[in-house]
């Protein structure tokens, strides 16, 4: 069993470093970015250790020569994790909200539901407007579309239709998103 002192996850080593580099000859890039030329792997590792740094493989040339950089691997990993965390934080999450209507909804109820949809749209969410047909109401598809049109007219100043009204089982669904 793998013993870990601080119960952390094992490090997934994507980049070969130091002795884990397989190529016999490597093209070296110094710690400040200048090319030092091709060297044998052992000489390159020794050069990195003299500077108190690590040798990390950053690429491979078609002729089998590995491209390696001298750097502080701990600092490099920290910066990568920080960059990934920042990218994840800046990711925009769009939520789907749903408003349910019926064919014979009253005007005041329709306005109230439209206000709720307006709140969702102002928050940047995508809104699914579902109109449910009960019993024999499914025969009055035109009334359902008319109700959806009335609802959309209440919010059309801040919303645009992403997906037109489509019948799925007993629901007439339409998706709207905020205008940009």
UniProtKB/Swiss-Prot annotation:
This is Translation initiation factor IF-3. HAMAP family: IF_3 (MF_00080). Belongs to the IF-3 family. The lineage of its organism: Bacteria, Bacillati, Mycoplasmatota, Mollicutes, Entomoplasmatales. IF-3 binds to the 30S ribosomal subunit and shifts the equilibrium between 70S ribosomes and their 50S and 30S subunits in favor of the free subunits, thus enhancing the availability of 30S subunits on which protein synthesis initiation begins. One of its GO terms (molecular function) is translation initiation factor activity. It comes from Mesoplasma florum (strain ATCC 33453 / NBRC 100688 / NCTC 11704 / L1). The gene is infC. Monomer. PROSITE patterns: IF3. It is found in: Cytoplasm. PANTHER family: TRANSLATION INITIATION FACTOR IF-3 (PTHR10938), TRANSLATION INITIATION FACTOR IF-3, MITOCHONDRIAL (PTHR10938:SF0). The keyword Protein biosynthesis applies. Disulfide bonds: none annotated. GO terms for biological process: ribosome disassembly. GO terms for cellular component: cytosol; membrane. Keywords: Cytoplasm, Initiation factor, Protein biosynthesis. SUPFAM superfamilies: Translation initiation factor IF3, C-terminal domain, Translation initiation factor IF3, N-terminal domain.
């Amino acid at each position: 069993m793998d013993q870990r002192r601080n119960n952390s996850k094992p490090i997934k080593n994507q980049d070969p470093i130091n002795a884990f580099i397989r190529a016999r000859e490597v093209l070296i890039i110094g710690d400040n970015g200048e090319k030092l030329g091709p060297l044998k792997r052992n000489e390159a590792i020794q050069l990195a250790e003299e500077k108190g740094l690590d040798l990390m493989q950053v690429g491979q040339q078609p002729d089998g020569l590995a491209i390696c950089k001298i750097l502080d691997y701990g600092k490099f990993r920290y910066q990568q994790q920080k960059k990934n965390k920042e990218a994840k934080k800046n990711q925009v999450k769009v939520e789907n909200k749903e408003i349910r209507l019926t064919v014979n909804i009253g005007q005041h109820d329709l306005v109230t539901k439209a206000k709720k949809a307006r709140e969702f749209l102002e928050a940047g969410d995508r809104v699914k407007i579902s109109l449910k047909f009960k019993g024999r109401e499914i025969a009055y598809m035109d009334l359902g579309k008319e109700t959806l049109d009335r609802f959309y007219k209440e919010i059309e100043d801040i919303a645009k239709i992403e997906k037109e009204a489509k019948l799925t089982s007993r629901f007439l669904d339409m998706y709207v998103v905020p205008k940009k």
